[in-house]
Amino acid sequence: MTDIYPQANNNVLVTGACGEIGQALVQELAKRGGHRIVTADIAPLPDAIKDKVAEHILGDLVYKIKIFYDYDFDVIFHLAASLSSKAEVATEEAHRINVEGTMQLLMLAAYRSEKYKKTVKFLFPSSIAAYGMSLPEKKSAGLVKENEYSSPHTMYGCNKLYCEKLGMYYSHYYGQHHLDSHPPVMLDFRALRFPGLISAFTLPSGGTSDYGPEMLHAAAQGKPYACFVREDTKISFMAMPDAIKSLLMLTDVSRKNLSHVVYNVAAFALTAGEFRDRALKSFPDARITFEPNPRRQGIVDSWPEDVDDSLARHDWGWKPDYDVNSFFDNYFLPQIRKRYGKN
């Protein structure tokens, strides 16, 4: 890896760069140009993004944090996380990764913002897991706003909600310096609550919302698939390009246009049964059954069927490029067919 952007205007840190969101974000930042991209992950960089990165920090973020104090980052995209299902198995480890890692990066951004009198932007992908509700509430809630049902049922959701609050604190109230006669420059924290994200170019990683893409990958390969949630289970989803679009739109917008720190974004909502129907339409020989796993079902049942993203639409012009039909017809299915030779 070399310094491919020696005259770059922005120094950018992307943690969790080897994940689905991280790889897509690095590719888009490199495509835009003008960024010197530093990445961090516990895994080596995949070949797809190696030539787009100036430097990669390999290792556990919590233990590597001192290294980052030597860098002059303009923007931090903190994507590294222990996801929902894994976090339920290893709760203490999830808290260490999700909370301690986030807090240490927030402290870094706060320190650099104050010392060098230059605001560091801190972009944080939160999740619909930050919500928590009973199944009857889920069925009756309709479009859920950012300030509703904020009692998450999972460690991952608790971590995300708490980190949203930490971000607000470090942005506005850190050390109560906002009360000083001459307040210091503070970091600029911005968060998105993502729905289930689906990439056409990477394999599902076993996440709690991955039953939809897993179903279609199995159908394309002629493999049977037992879906781990009920047929009527419904949550919101988004194509990965729209996730990256929303993240960069929120990065670019002026702070004066933002009325909130945390924003919902949405694209379309589907039941598991509707995913099955799409799979059968494209792959008529698909063998799909429903065998709910009580724990994973319980997690998804605590998430809203859909969210209200009107704040994002109003404040910074958010609008997804992919609705449900264009997602399947123009984005996801063409790549699935290509991957498995079904053209």
What do the PLM-derived regions correspond to, one by one?
Residues 87-88, 149, 193-206, 214-238:
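A conserved pocket-lining segment of Rossmann-fold NAD(P)-dependent short-chain dehydrogenase/reductase
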Residues 61-97:
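NAD(P)H-binding glycine-rich loop region in Rossmannoid oxidoreductase-like domains
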Residues 103-155:
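Conserved Rossmann-fold NAD(P)-dependent oxidoreductase catalytic core, especially the SDR/UDP-sugar
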Residues 133-136, 151-189:
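Active-site Tyr-X1-5-Lys
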Residues 12-32:
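N-terminal Rossmann NAD(P)H-binding glycine-rich loop of SDR-like oxidoreductase domains
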Residues 161, 185, 197-213, 240-241, ...:
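Glycine/proline-rich active-site loop of Rossmann-fold NAD(P)-dependent oxidoreductases
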Residues 223, 228-231, 236-343:
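C-terminal substrate-binding subdomain of Rossmann-fold SDR/epimerase-dehydratase oxidoreductases
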